[in-house]
Amino acid sequence: MTMTMKSLSDERLIVQAVINGMGANLLLDTGATVGLLSDGIKRKYKLILGKKFPRKLVGAGGEFTAYYCHTFAYVGGKPVTQFLVADIDNVAASVREQTGIEIQGIMSLPQMKQAGIQIDANDNLIMIEE
């Protein structure tokens, strides 16, 4: 069985998630190899941080340091794991400027595959295998 969700935006693929019982918006990024949660939400969402990630990450927002995160996000009731916590303010600002939506994190392609997520980009639909 498959659950279908509509993206919160037509400009970017954004889904609603739950992190520690609170709603969050995650940008789906098929070009990302790691999932990121904003370091700006770590207190409010009570993120459990681990050790410093051993490498610098380079992305659209530049180069940055990240920490392992031991907190899951749930999308359509399915757990999404393996997030890092980093400063994603530049990416979040770009998304907010384009869509008016505040994101709390970025879900990577490996995470989407792990959660059984498929994308219909033409109709901005996200299908999740249950």
Language-model features, listed with the residues they occupy:
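Pepsin/retropepsin-fold aspartyl endopeptidases
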Residues: 1-130
